[in-house]
Amino acid sequence: MEFLWAPLLGLCCSLAAADRHTVFWNSSNPKFRNEDYTIHVQLNDYVDIICPHYEDHSVADAAMEQYILYLVEHEEYQLCQPQSKDQVRWQCNRPSAKHGPEKLSEKFQRFTPFTLGKEFKEGHSYYYISKPIHQHEDRCLRLKVTVSGKITHSPQAHDNPQEKRLAADDPEVRVLHSIGHSAAPRLFPLAWTVLLLPLLLLQTP
C-alpha cells in the first residue's frame, strides 16, 4: 500500500502548484482594449474564461453579449479571422443562465488523455479570438497565452566528446580483457617431465 502514496502525493503536489488565470471575456473588460492582451502560464496551469452574464432584464436579449471563441494560428490571430469551424473552442451563448456565468477552462498540459484534447508545449504561444453572436460588428476580442518554459543551453564549444567516453572505448588505452591469460607462472613440457619421472620410476617392477 505504501507504494500507492508516491503517485498520489505527486498528483496532489502538481495540482497544488497549478495556478488559475481568469479572463472575463466581454467588451467592457479594459484589458481587451490593448491589441496585445497576453497571459503567461506554466505547464499544468489553467485559464478560466468567464462568459458574459446578466442577472436582470435591464438588457434586451438581442443586446446580451454572446461569443464564439476560436483557437487559431498567429496569422489568423493578427487578422482576427478564423479559417475553419474546426477551430471553434467554446461558445459563450448562455448570458442569462440561472446558475450564473459560464466558466470555460483550458488546462495547458503537455499531454492529454482525451482524443479531442489540446496539447501544449513550453516556450510556445497560443492564440484565442472571438466572433460576436449577438451582433454583426467586427470588433475583435483576442488573447495570447504564452507557456513559459525552461531555457536549455546548447553544449559548449570546448566540450570534448572524447572525454566522456569510457577508457575501454579508446583504442590507445591498454586494458585488461576478461579473456586475457592467467597471471600464474607457466610450466613448460620439460619441467613437467622432470617432475613426473621419479613417480614413473617408482611404479616400475
Curated annotation (Swiss-Prot):
Tissues expressing the protein: Brain. Down-regulated in primary glioma tissues compared to the normal tissues. The soluble monomeric form is expressed in the glioblastoma multiforme (GBM) and breast cancer cells (at protein level).
Q: How does it sit in the membrane?
A: Lipid-anchor; GPI-anchor
Induction remark: By TNF and IL1B/interleukin-1 beta.
In this protein, the residues bearing a glycan are: N26
Which residues are assigned to the propeptide feature?
183-205
Question: What does UniProt give as GO cellular component?
Answer: extracellular region; plasma membrane; side of membrane
- How is the protein altered post-translationally, as described in the entry? Undergoes proteolysis by a metalloprotease to give rise to a soluble monomeric form.
Pfam families assigned to the protein according to its UniProt record, in alphabetical order: Ephrin
Biological process (GO) annotations held by this record are: angiogenesis; aortic valve morphogenesis; axon guidance; cell migration; cell-cell signaling; central nervous system neuron differentiation; endocardial cushion to mesenchymal transition involved in heart valve formation; ephrin receptor signaling pathway
One GO MF annotation is: signaling receptor binding
Q: Where in the cell is it found?
A: Cell membrane
All residue ranges annotated as the Ephrin RBD domain in the record: 19-151
Q: Does the keyword Aminoacyl-tRNA synthetase apply?
A: no
Recorded family membership: Belongs to the ephrin family.
- Do you know which PANTHER family this protein is assigned to? EPHRIN, EPHRIN-A1
Instruction: State the protein's purpose.
Output: Cell surface GPI-bound ligand for Eph receptors, a family of receptor tyrosine kinases which are crucial for migration, repulsion and adhesion during neuronal, vascular and epithelial development. Binds promiscuously Eph receptors residing on adjacent cells, leading to contact-dependent bidirectional signaling into neighboring cells. Plays an important role in angiogenesis and tumor neovascularization. The recruitment of VAV2, VAV3 and PI3-kinase p85 subunit by phosphorylated EPHA2 is critical for EFNA1-induced RAC1 GTPase activation and vascular endothelial cell migration and assembly.
**Know the name of this protein?**
Ephrin-A1
Source organism: Homo sapiens
